[in-house]
Amino acid sequence: MNRLMIVSLLGIATALGGCVNPPPKPNDPYYAPVLPRTPLPAAQNNGAIYQAGFEQNLYDDRKAFRVGDIITITLNEKTQASKKANSDIQKDSKTKMGLTSLFGSGMTTNNPIGGGDLSLSAEYGGSRDAKGDSQAGQSNSLTGSITVTVAEVLPNGILSVRGEKWMTLNTGNELVRIAGLVRADDIATDNTVSSTRVADARITYSGTGAFADASQPGWLDRFFLSPLWPF
């Protein structure tokens, strides 16, 4: 019995351990810096003022609009959510059956052991009651900045940007990743844009090391918080 219990606990620990998300790794190719697809031609030392390939429109600014350009995204994320659910289910039932006659004859007879007459009658009842109450709340805030590169320019002029930032601390690494779509008109003159202006944003803030491990519940805690716990 003890051996079976140990094997069962090891199986549960293994299953719950497999449900843990693997820690992020640096140098993800998807978030690697994107270089310009067409390199600028080499400048010619011919003494001319105009150099082919280096021209710029008189009304252009220095805002990013090409593949490989750099944009700084200011993180201003704040979310708050709450959820509450109540349920109450109750069911009562009662049934009574009695036969007083059969083919015109009475169904009561003298009880041979005393205590009154006997009759073919039955009565039963039942009651069920189930109640549930759940409440969840979550609040997140993320501020800071991250510099990314333009990965693609869509036909309508929308910029697809992505990038990551790794910070190595004494006790581990901190990671910020972001990817999304930016409208060129939302970019300020200093090549910055708020994260609230990034469409289809994918923002990841994670880390590795002692602090990240301390915030993760143990395998036994995950079992009690998982749907496998029957109570």
From Swiss-Prot:
Its main location: membrane. Residues 1-18 form the signal peptide. Coiled coil: none annotated. Pfam families: FlgH (PF02107). One of its GO terms (biological process) is bacterial-type flagellum-dependent cell motility. A lipid is attached at residue 19 (S-diacylglycerol cysteine). Residues 118-141 are annotated as: Disordered. A lipid is attached at residue 19 (N-palmitoyl cysteine). GO terms for molecular function: cytoskeletal motor activity. Keywords: Bacterial flagellum, Cell outer membrane, Lipoprotein, Membrane, Palmitate, Signal. It is found in: Cell outer membrane; Bacterial flagellum basal body. PROSITE patterns: PROKAR_LIPOPROTEIN. InterPro entries: Flag_Lring. GO terms for cellular component: bacterial-type flagellum basal body, distal rod, L ring; cell outer membrane. It is a lipid-anchor. The basal body constitutes a major portion of the flagellar organelle and consists of four rings (L,P,S, and M) mounted on a central rod. Belongs to the FlgH family. Assembles around the rod to form the L-ring and probably protects the motor/basal body from shearing forces during rotation. PANTHER family: FLAGELLAR L-RING PROTEIN. NCBIfam families: PRK00249.1-4 (NF001304). This is Flagellar L-ring protein. It comes from Pseudomonas aeruginosa (strain ATCC 15692 / DSM 22644 / CIP 104116 / JCM 14847 / LMG 12228 / 1C / PRS 101 / PAO1).
